[in-house]
Each structure stands twice: as C-alpha cells, then as structure tokens.
Amino acid sequence: MVRRAQRSENDQLTGLKTGSSVTKGFAEGVRRGETHPEEFVIAEEVQEALRKGTPVVALESAIITHGMPYPINLELAQELEGIVRKGGAIPATTALVSGKIRVGLSKSELEMLARAKWVKKIGPRDIPVAVAMGFSGGTTVAASLHIADAAGIRVFVTGGIGGVHRGVSEVLDISQDLPVIGRARCITVCAGAKSILDLRNTLEYLETMSVLVLGYQTDTLPAFYVRDSGIPIEYRVDSASDIAAIVEARDRLNLDTGILVTNPIAETDQVDPAKHEKVLQAALKKAAEEQVEGKAMTPYILAYMQKNLPGVIEANIALIKSNVALGTQIATLLKHT
C-alpha cells in the first residue's frame, strides 16, 4: 500500500550520461553482449545476469576503502555480497581498479581495496583522471550510481547518501550524490542522508531535482545512524512489491524521475540520538579548527564519530545489511528483460 504521509558535476562517465538515451543504448548493448569501452569492465557473472534478465544489485566500494577499518570492511563487503546472493540476485560491487571501471569484483580485488591505504575516493568528476592515470579507488554513491546506471542495473544500495552540508548559506557544499540520484534510472536504497548533514535542505534539494523519495514503513526521513529525523516525507510505502510497482510505472511512462528508497535503521540498532548530536557538534567544531572541507569532510566526521560514539560501527553495519536485504527483495520483483 502506498499513501501520502501527513505533512503540510559531472555528467560524464566515459562518454555516457545517466538517464539519457545514450546510456539506455549502452545498457541494452551490455545485455546483448556487445562491445563496450575497454575501460568499462563488467564481470562475466554480472554481464551474463544482465543478458539473461537475472536480478543484479549494485553496491558501492567507498565504504570498503574509506568507511571502515580493516578487516571489518572486508568482512562486511563479503557479507553484503552474500546477502544479495541469498536473496536470489547477483552482486555487482563497483570500483576503479588500475584505471579500469569495474562492475563486479573478484575476492582478490575486494581484499586489495580493503587493505590498501593509497587508494582514492572516487566521485563522478574523478573518473576520467582515475582512468587516464591508472588509479584504483572506492567509488562514492554518485560514482557507483553512474556506473550501475550505465551498465543497466536497476537497483543500487548504499548505507547513507550525501546531501546538503550544514552551513550551506556560507559555503555552497552539496554532495554530487543528489543530482546523480535525480538523473539515474537505477533506484537508490539507503538509510536516508548521513546524519551529519542538513537534512531538511537535503530533502528540499531532492524535491528540486525531481527525486521521488519513498519512506519504507516510515512517515519521516531516516537519518542514517538515527531512525527518525522528525522531518516528514510525502510518500510512505509498506512493502517491497509496492516499491517495485512504482518503479515499473515510472519506467512504463518513461519519466525522468529518480527514485530514492529510505529504509530506517531498526530501533534496536540506532545510536542514542542525544549522544549522537553532542558528538556530532564536537566533530564539526574540530573539523572547522583543522580546516577540513570538501570531500574530506564526510570521512573525517564519520571517523571522529566512530572513535568517540560507542555503537557507531555496529549501527553502520546493521543499517547497510538491512538496506541490502531490502534492495535485493526489490530487485527480484522488478522485470529484467
């Protein structure tokens, strides 16, 4: 059942734009087994699944390279792929490996990304540099979604998305995630925007980008580590089948509307909201003192919170597992022909 809740950078990916007829044609070519740019390497298992119409779920790799310490990051990456397989879909973790865009990683590649300290954090604007210079790195939400969309994958799962940063009136700091979510045909499943952000303005920006925000069994926007931000969202959806029906309706109508599914962390897994806000304010103050800014800000704040707020890593693991389970369920309900 679907009901209204009560409430008053860069477009290029090796020459492809998400949401465009070019990308759709590329994705169709992938499914037919035709050639694609040599820098765009789709694992054989993933390519076969796309050709046969087997559900595929895309996963990011920045959480492996920059989100958690080793070996927790590697264990989590392997477990997430296992959840996808158990749910009846094929996992496709995205990354840059030696200048190649990878859709689906081997065990050795996951190990390398989890262990290496020198790998980059790669957003959409960084992809051409990484390809040209032969870099390896973890792909952000925006870059992962670009890649998944270009490959013809219909569901992408992450922990939390980026958004509008606090103090945006002083520094115009808005994540690349938001416009990419707005353009992509591939839907994004997450636990809301990261709680370190300006969540109200993030929701407003998503509306400006014509993103349909769905609350999975919730009337309010989830806030990553915290279950309830208190900010109402317009559409509550109580089943994966309803989400799949909405996606199919959008696609039949050929609407250029991104879809963001927000899945709140379980109440038993969330961190204490009051303690969270106290530690967050301390982290923001320290970041300002050390002049941390740009794409370094989110990893800095999250690392500070992991160190100073008990239960953060456990909450992060719990929420992304829940998101992957939901995303896999949605993927298996969608048509993949």
Q: PLM features: residue spans?
A:
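General beta-strand structural signal in soluble alpha/beta enzymes
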Residues: V57-L59, P91-L96, G137, V155-G160, ...
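Short Gly/Ser/Thr- and charged-rich N-terminal loops/segments
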Residues: Q6, K17, G25-V30, E60
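Glycine-rich nucleotide/cofactor/substrate-binding loop typically near the N-terminus or early
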Residues: S61, H66-M68, L74-A130, R252-T268, ...
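Active-site glycine-rich loop that binds ribose-phosphate moieties when present
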Residues: G138-V141, S169-G182, I187-E207, A240-A245
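Anionic-ligand binding region
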Residues: R227-D251
